[in-house]
Amino acid sequence: MRKLKFVYVRIDVEKHFVETSGIRFYDFYCGIGNKPNHILVLKGCPSDSLYHKGLCLEYMSNEQIHSFIQSDSCHHGDFCWVDFAQEENLNYISDKELSELLFIAHKFEPLDGIKFNSINNRYIYCSHDDEYLTRIYMDAEKYIDVIEFVVLDHLKQKNKILFSGEIKDILFQLCQSGIIFDFEQKSDRIKLYIVQEKIKIDDIHKRLATFRKQENGWYLMMKDNEWTLDRL
């Protein structure tokens, strides 16, 4: 079983992306409400996939995604993809769109916008070593569902009580400053540290002990069968 020490989440509302460390593709897929129907693989080597000759790219069906998240192959290396609605959508990707997709695979950021009309995508997903560093371009407010999944999965609650709308709204606001969810201590409450700066993922790992000493964080905990956020 994976021992989760911490999760870092920063939401950039203006640029429409979520940057994380400690959250796997498995967590994203299980937690997100609107799951991708298919994914076009821009970077990475899934063991079970289909090949589109026109694009010279691999893609995965919904069934293949289910198999992929259970395999070891999604836990290593870079993995970059966009989702698409129907298989036939791939035939309508223009040369310009293809060049923009390949740019994403190379730079891990979009060249011009996060939506591709031909494939009707909702996500652009770019990760390095699965959980070490991930950036997802999407409707960032919906990412709170993934955080909820990670928290509930970590605590292993038998009767999983979901976050209220109020808790989700507060977490969304806090994530815009950058939050560390600290899972180091075995407890029914989770410490949240506010980063309040743009920071490299490597620095978070190096400075984790420093963040644990700060006093401007929060406790996410269960009280009377509902989630609450209390200041440290």
Regions found by a protein language model. Name each.
Residues 1-232:
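Structured alpha/beta or helical-core interaction and ligand-binding surfaces enriched in interleaved
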